[in-house]
């Protein structure tokens, strides 16, 4: 599923998370950020709440295992919850919730990431870009709409793309290490991402941190190794998905 998503994203017009990520994934498989022998397992199922451990591997296989149970449970009980811990980057969160909406479910997803957003007025990153996504089912197995947005003005991967392409970033996307606005993507990666809507974006980041990391038992963003470069071991971040049946 990791490969399927990576190949599909450029079709959606999402270049920053598509095929450009293949070299990064390969690098992280070689350096140990991703466990090449990962065997995700269901840790527990209590009523309609499922917990999966990704074993420091890609999030996608762990999410797949959880979704096998999540959809049927949501339809049988009206709503169900899946948490995933100890996972690597899950790619575009909206892709996952859209899969649930294709099964006729309203789906909400959360995923935390290594810290890259500082509190309003601060300089030290505390939470990650921490996206939240919503998918609503439509007709003929198609989603009526999918909302996928991060707690930052723009995804961190967009900054990484600008570094690779040697292009500047718009003012207001990120701050340098001194907390000043910068248009240099390299300086932005040394500093912090600008929260969307100021303190409100940081608040969304905290909400996602609770849902994706605290509830799942994953590593908090402030302690997780980065999704870029080779420093540190597996980031062991987490995800949380809520599935609701409109027929309940």
Functional labels for PLM-detected ranges:
Residues 2-9:
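Short, small-residue-biased leader/transition segments that mark boundaries at the very start
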Residues 8, 22-27, 68-71, 98-101, ...:
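Predominant activation on well-ordered alpha-helical scaffold segments within soluble catalytic domains
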Residues 15-33, 161-163, 168-170, 177:
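Acidic, glycine/proline-rich low-complexity segments that act as flexible tails and inter-domain linkers
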Residues 18-71:
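Active-site cofactor/substrate anionic-group-binding motifs, chiefly glycine-
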Residues 42-53, 64-80, 175-190:
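Residues forming anionic-ligand binding surfaces in small-molecule and nucleic-acid pockets
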Residues 51-139:
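A generic, well-ordered mixed alpha/beta core segment in the N-terminal half of proteins
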Residues 116-186:
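Phosphate/diphosphate-binding glycine-rich loops and adjacent basic-rich segments that engage nucleotide
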Residues 191-248:
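Internal helical hairpin/lid segments
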């Amino acid at each position: 599923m990791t490969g399927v998503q990576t190949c599909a994203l450029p079709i959606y017009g999402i270049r920053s998370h598509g095929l450009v990520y293949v070299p990064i994934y390969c690098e992280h498989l070689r350096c140990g950020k991703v466990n090449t022998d990962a065997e995700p397992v269901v840790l527990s199922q209590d009523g309609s709440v499922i917990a999966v451990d990704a074993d420091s591997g890609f999030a996608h296989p762990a999410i797949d295992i959880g979704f096998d149970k999540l959809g049927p449970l949501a339809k049988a009980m009206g709503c169900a919850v899946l948490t995933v811990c100890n996972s690597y980057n899950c790619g575009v969160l909206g892709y996952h919730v859209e899969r649930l909406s294709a099964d006729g479910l309203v789906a909400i997803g959360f995923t935390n990431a290594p810290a890259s957003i500082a509190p309003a007025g601060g300089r030290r990153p505390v939470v990650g870009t921490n996206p939240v996504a919503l998918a609503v089912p439509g007709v003929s197995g198609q989603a009526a709409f999918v909302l996928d947005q991060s707690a930052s003005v723009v995804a961190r991967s967009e900054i990484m793309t600008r570094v690779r392409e040697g292009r500047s970033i718009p003012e207001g996307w990120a701050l340098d290490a001194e907390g000043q606005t910068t248009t240099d993507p390299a300086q932005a990666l040394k500093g912090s991402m600008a929260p969307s809507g100021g303190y409100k974006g940081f608040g969304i980041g905290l909400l996602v941190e609770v849902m994706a990391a605290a509830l799942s038992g994953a590593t908090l963003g402030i302690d997780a190794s980065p999704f870029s470069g080779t420093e540190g071991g597996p980031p062991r971040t987490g995800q949380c998905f809520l599935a609701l049946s409109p027929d309940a």
